[in-house]
A protein has these predicted regions:
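A mature extracytoplasmic/lumenal domain signature
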Residues: 50, 60-61, 91, 104-108, ...
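Short beta-strand edge/turn micro-motifs at domain boundaries
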Residues: 118-147
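Beta-strand elements of well-folded, non-transmembrane domains
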Residues: 39, 108-110, 127
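Hydrophobic pocket/interface hotspot
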Residues: 34, 46-47, 54, 71, ...
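Surface-exposed, charged secondary-structure patches
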Residues: 71-114
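Short, low-complexity N-terminal intrinsically disordered segments enriched in polar/charged residues
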Residues: 11-44, 48
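A short gly/proline-enriched turn/hairpin at secondary-structure junctions
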Residues: 55-64, 80
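Sec-dependent signal peptide recognition
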Residues: 2-10
Length: 147
């Protein structure tokens, strides 16, 4: 009887670990992590969230990059008044086993918490192995990337 209990406890713990792994890597978590690392200006962490090449459609411009440092220039963004960005909403448009598109609304703020701009972006994510990665960002307006 103790043997069966030990097996059940082991299976429970193993399944808990698997679901914790999934909870830490799903499209919404990747989007949240992206905004967190964007605000931290951590290019290396941002690069880890993307499936290369990074593809950005911003207004009428298309940016294809090997690193997020080719997409954004933080020094120029700060000169333009940017201090941080905040997600207002993220809603799945398409959600499949290995592909997802999220409509994400976000706002940029200055260092006095005054809104600079709000916009929607469509973020396409793909699953590579066990991990979700950002693939394409489509922002319909000409929002500055600091470039």
């Amino acid at each position: 009887m103790i043997f069966i209990r030990n097996i059940l406890v082991t299976l429970f713990l193993f399944s808990s670990l698997l679901s914790a792994k999934d909870a830490n890597n799903n499209p919404e978590k990747v989007i949240e992590d992206f905004f967190y690392h964007f605000n931290e200006m951590d290019i290396n962490k941002i690069n880890e969230l993307w499936d290369l090449p990074i593809t950005y459609f911003v207004g009428g411009e298309i940016i294809v990059a090997k690193s997020y440092s080719e997409v954004v220039n933080y020094e120029n963004l700060k000169k333009e008044g940017w201090s941080y960005s905040k997600i207002n909403s993220k809603n799945p448009i398409v959600s499949q086993e290995d592909f997802a598109i999220y409509k994400t609304n976000f706002t940029r703020f200055n260092n006095q918490d005054i809104e600079l701009i709000s916009t929607d972006t469509n973020l396409t994510l793909i699953k590579r192995g066990d991990y979700w990665k950002l693939k394409i960002a489509i922002i319909p307006i000409n929002i500055s990337t600091g470039r």
